Swiss-Prot record:
It is a peripheral membrane protein. PANTHER family: D,D-DIPEPTIDE TRANSPORT ATP-BINDING PROTEIN DDPF-RELATED, TRANSPORT ATP-BINDING PROTEIN. It comes from Shigella dysenteriae serotype 1 (strain Sd197). ATP binds at G45, R46, S47, G48, C49, G50, K51, S52. This is Nickel import ATP-binding protein NikE. It comes from the Bacteria. It is found in: Cell inner membrane. The complex is composed of two ATP-binding proteins (NikD and NikE), two transmembrane proteins (NikB and NikC) and a solute-binding protein (NikA).
């Protein structure tokens, strides 16, 4: 089942010039893509190529300058009030900057309950039980419930944001560099959790990342973005090889997992 369909999407930002006239800075250019239920797709690209802007458009935080975004066959621009509420529940995003994504005055308990209060019909006791369950799933315990964001480490706060997104059991989870910054042990645990959700609920995942190792471990498809365009789409197999210049640059930039000893025939 197709969850998200994007066709001929372009976007620009207007800013004033010295002459007083508005100038347009193109960020996305004729982007098209499809995401299906239960699949895991990576959007790979260097910083500043338009990945995060595309994500903001996909979840409805901004409207595109041109093109169409459809959710389950319905254009986002034409969703009625009830459909928009369901859309906000079904598609969740975890941002790279977790500090800006939460209210620093709220406790973790309040942060986790917020989407459940607005998007789900759960009693308070059920909300609290699910909050505790989601914390456990991201390797945190109830001791953080009464803490506020400034009292948490960056990794802890990132996991709180992930738990908040998972609490409403979304159909599509977009992670904007949200897993790449975790250590390898936590990253592996989060990936196991996401695989479980995919099996249980058919949750689709879109990883926005520059981490090629994450792509190879978890994703089924990868799209390479460069200068606001998707320049290549590849299935992820045993040996991932890119044909685009942008893809090859990213692949060549990956460091080996362990230091490689150079061979030499010279004797010291």
């Amino acid at each position: 089942m197709t969850l998200l369909n994007v066709s001929d999407l372009s976007h620009h930002y207007a800013h004033g010039g010295f002459s007083g006239k508005h100038q347009h800075q193109a960020v996305l250019n004729n982007v098209s893509l499809t995401l299906k239920s239960g699949e895991t797709v990576a959007l790979l690209g260097r910083s500043g190529c338009g990945k995060s802007t595309l994500a903001r458009l996909l979840i409805g935080l901004e409207s595109p300058s041109q093109g169409n975004i459809s959710w389950r066959g319905e254009p986002l621009a034409k969703l009625n009030r009830a459909q928009r509420k369901a859309f906000r529940r079904d598609i969740q995003m975890v941002f790279q900057d977790s500090i800006s994504a939460v209210n620093p005055r709220k406790t973790v308990r309040e942060i986790l309950r917020e989407p459940m209060r607005h998007l789900l019909s759960l009693k308070k006791s059920e909300q609290l039980a699910r909050a505790s369950e989601m914390l456990k799933a991201v390797d945190l315990d109830d001791s953080v419930l009464d803490k506020r964001p400034p009292q948490l480490s960056g990794g802890q706060l990132q996991r709180v944001c992930l738990a908040r997104a998972l609490a409403v059991e979304p159909k599509l989870l977009i992670l904007d560099e949200a897993v790449s910054n975790l250590d390898l042990v936590l990253q592996a645990g989060v990936i196991r959790l996401l695989k479980k959700l995919q099996q249980q609920f058919g949750t689709a995942c879109l990883f926005i990342t520059h981490d090629l190792r994450l792509v190879e471990r978890f994703c089924q498809r990868v799209m390479v973005m460069d200068n606001g365009q998707i320049v290549e789409t590849q299935a992820v197999g045993d040996k991932l090889t890119f044909s685009s210049d942008a893809g090859r640059v990213l692949q060549n930039a990956v460091l080996p997992a362990f230091p490689v000893r150079r061979r030499t025939s010279e004797k010291v």
